[in-house]
Regions:
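Conserved interdomain hinge at the start of the Helicase C-terminal
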Residues: 1-51
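Conserved nucleotide-binding/hydrolysis micro-motifs of P-loop NTPases
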Residues: 40-42, 95-97, 113-117, 128-129, ...
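Conserved P-loop NTPase
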Residues: 1, 152, 159-166
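A short beta-strand element within the Helicase C-terminal
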Residues: 90-91, 98-113, 121-122, 137-142
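Conserved helicase ATPase core of P-loop NTP-dependent helicases/translocases
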Residues: 34, 44-45, 54-97
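Short glycine-/polar-rich loops that comprise or flank the Walker A/P-loop
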Residues: 55-56, 103-107, 132-139, 163-165
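Conserved segment of the helicase C-terminal RecA-like domain
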Residues: 126-159
């Protein structure tokens, strides 16, 4: 049987997989990107793999940013994305559930597998908001060739259909 606690490190530490994700991020540099993962270390790794010229266009937020100064940084990162000063916001799934309202977002990257309907729907909702001049939002869902991951994809696919997404 598959042990989930071993699967996530296997996926998040896979260099080829991470290079594919970063390739998608670089290809979408003109968009406003929300990158979600279960692991803060994974988000840090993806961010570090971006070309240096894109680093100033990134911010990372997570639910552990609870001290006064960390909370201020989190609020500033969200405001920077709202205003368009940054193009990449790296966040934990947990934080994305906490009413992250940035209508400008138009690209979503689900970098670790999720099956929970509420989490998937809330994540999609982050890019579904209307914003002047915003094109069709796109969600990148990375499905690994592992039975467990494929089964979770089937559940997410159902969530996407219920949310009115085009697959």
């Amino acid at each position: 049987t598959l042990v989930y606690s071993k699967l996530i490190p296997y996926l998040t530490e896979n260099l080829e997989r991470n290079q594919m994700i970063v390739g998608d991020l670089v290809a979408n540099r003109g968009h406003h990107n929300l990158i979600l993962s279960d692991r803060l270390q994974h988000l840090q790794q993806l961010r570090a793999m971006l070309p240096a010229e894109l680093w100033e266009l990134t911010a990372m937020i997570d639910g552990k940013m609870t001290s006064k100064s960390a909370k201020a940084k989190r609020i500033q990162a969200i405001e920077d994305m709202r205003s368009g000063r940054i193009r990449y916001l790296f966040a934990s799934f947990g934080l994305a559930k906490e009413g992250l309202d940035i209508p400008r977002l138009d690209r979503l990257y689900l970098t670790t597998p999720k099956k929970d309907y509420a989490v998937v729907t809330q994540s999609i909702g982050r890019i579904a908001r209307t914003f002047e001049g915003k094109g069709q939002p796109v969600c990148y869902d990375y499905v690994d060739n592992i039975g467990f991951c494929e089964n979770q994809w089937k559940r997410r696919r159902t969530s996407y259909r219920k949310a009115g997404c085009i697959l």
